[in-house]
Design a protein with these regions (language model features):
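Non-heme di-metal
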Residues: 1-68
Length: 68
């Protein structure tokens, strides 16, 4: 595979990685608030969504490292 280093594609993947990471942090934060307020089921949904965002970020990072 051709190297992504310095390409627009590499920049786009890095932006996507940052977005997935930020989304995970938001969902984790909102989940903690929901749990604190007693909305356990809502907190679980936020936690599951945060885990999905984490997996997306891991795949993007792995791709940048040449692991895919």
């Amino acid at each position: 595979m051709k190297s992504l280093k310095g390409s627009r594609t590499e920049r786009n993947i890095m932006v996507a990685f940052a977005g997935e990471s930020e989304a995970r942090n938001r969902y984790t934060y909102w989940g903690a608030i929901a749990k604190k307020e007693g909305y356990v089921q809502v907190a679980n949904i936020f936690e599951e969504t945060a885990n999905q965002e984490k997996e997306h970020a891991k795949r993007l990072f792995k791709f940048l490292e040449g692991g895919m």
